[in-house]
C-alpha cells in the first residue's frame, strides 16, 4: 500500500532528524530507460514544482499526499528488500527536498546503486549513479482543455518553470545522465531536437544519441498501444533509444508498480 495510507504522518518523523515526505515505497522492476528490467526499490517523494497534465503520479503533484518518514526509517525499509541493490528516488520532484541529499549519501555509503528521476529544473550535489532527467515539453502544459482539474490555473507557472537549460547542462556535467522525453505525438520532435541542441551547447560533457530516450506517454495498456509503435519509429528515425514503460506492460496502471 502507499506509505500515506499505512503510516501516521508524524509517528515516522523521527523528531528533528532528516526526513522526507514519502508517497510510496515499494519493490518492483525499473520500467523505463537504460536500466529497464532491473529489480529496484522505489522511494517516491511527494511534492512537485510542475504540473504535467498527464502526470502518472497524480498524488505527488496535483493532489499531493504523503507520510513524513525519517531517513532512518526509509533506509530500514529499503534494506528489507534483500534482492534489490538498486534504489530509484522519484516523485513528484525528489530534488525539491534538502534531505534527499542525506538519503542519497546514506544509500551510497551502504553500496546501493541509485537512480534519481527528476524533471531537470533543480541541481543538487549528491552521490547519484544515474540522473534520469525528463525535461518537460510544451505538450505537458496543463491547458484549460487538458488540466485534470479543468481550469488551467497552473498553465503559466508550469510553462515558465518547465525548462532550465543551465540546470540541465549542469546535471549532464556532474552525473551519468539519460535524457528521457515523454512523447505524446510526432509534433514533439522539433522541440526535442531544439532543446537537445541547447543542452549540448550548455555542457562540456558529450551527450550522445544513445543517452537520449523516447518514451510514449500513457499509463494504461490502451494508451501505450495507441502510441508505442509511432514513438518506436521516431526513435529509429532519429537514432535515439526507445524505452517501453515495462511496468505498464506488465501490470497496467496498478499502484506500486
UniProtKB/Swiss-Prot annotation:
Start and end residues of each Radical SAM core domain: 35-253
Family label: Belongs to the radical SAM superfamily. 7-carboxy-7-deazaguanine synthase family.
Protein name from the UniProt record: 7-carboxy-7-deazaguanine synthase
Cofactor(s) required for function per UniProt: [4Fe-4S] cluster; S-adenosyl-L-methionine; Mg(2+)
Database matches in SUPFAM superfamilies: Radical SAM enzymes
UniProt region (Disordered), positions on chain: 133-153
Claim: S-adenosyl-L-methionine is one of the keywords in the record: yes
InterPro entries: 7-CO-7-deazaguanine_synth-like, Aldolase_TIM, rSAM
Cofactor annotation remark: Binds 1 [4Fe-4S] cluster. The cluster is coordinated with 3 cysteines and an exchangeable S-adenosyl-L-methionine. Binds 1 S-adenosyl-L-methionine per subunit.
Reactions that this protein is recorded to catalyse: 6-carboxy-5,6,7,8-tetrahydropterin + H(+) = 7-carboxy-7-deazaguanine + NH4(+)
GO molecular-function term, one example from the UniProt record: 4 iron, 4 sulfur cluster binding
Key words of the record: 4Fe-4S, Iron, Iron-sulfur, Lyase, Magnesium, Metal-binding, Plasmid, S-adenosyl-L-methionine
Segments traversing the membrane: none
Gene3D superfamilies: Aldolase class I
Pfam families on file: Fer4_12, Radical_SAM
Entry EC number(s): 4.3.99.3
Quaternary assembly: Homodimer.
Residues binding substrate, per UniProt: 29-31, 44, 90
Positions contributing to [4Fe-4S] cluster binding: 48, 52, 55
Native source species: Halobacterium salinarum (strain ATCC 29341 / DSM 671 / R1)
Residues bound to Mg(2+): 57
Pathway field: Purine metabolism; 7-cyano-7-deazaguanine biosynthesis
Residues binding S-adenosyl-L-methionine: 92
Superkingdom, taxonomy of origin: Archaea
Function in brief: Catalyzes the complex heterocyclic radical-mediated conversion of 6-carboxy-5,6,7,8-tetrahydropterin (CPH4) to 7-carboxy-7-deazaguanine (CDG), a step common to the biosynthetic pathways of all 7-deazapurine-containing compounds.
